[in-house]
């Protein structure tokens, strides 16, 4: 048991040391590059396709919801030969977002009770 504890402490120490070295290696050029990428991401976010709108022109242009990006889903309507593509949120991601919202609200209540 003592060996496991000693090994765990050693592992945590090495991990924190490597994390500190990685932070030291993050120089000004990397910061400028990161800022330019963030600016491009913000600019791209303004041009996204809202949910339930046509995304056939660019299938990767769907907007993000609170946690996940919507997906361009294509289908053929009944009795039609034309393919229709719209930005939609898959059901499993929708349920995950609802669960995350409920967990946030519950966490806030716990904070009020004990905080």
From Swiss-Prot:
One of its GO terms (molecular function) is toxin activity. Expressed by the venom gland. Residues 1-20 form the signal peptide. It is found in: Secreted. Disulfide bonds join 48-63, 55-72, 62-87, 74-85. It holds the Pfam family Toxin_35. Belongs to the neurotoxin 19 (CSTX) family. 01 subfamily. This is U3-lycotoxin-Ls1v. It comes from Lycosa singoriensis. The lineage of its organism: Eukaryota, Metazoa, Ecdysozoa, Arthropoda, Chelicerata.
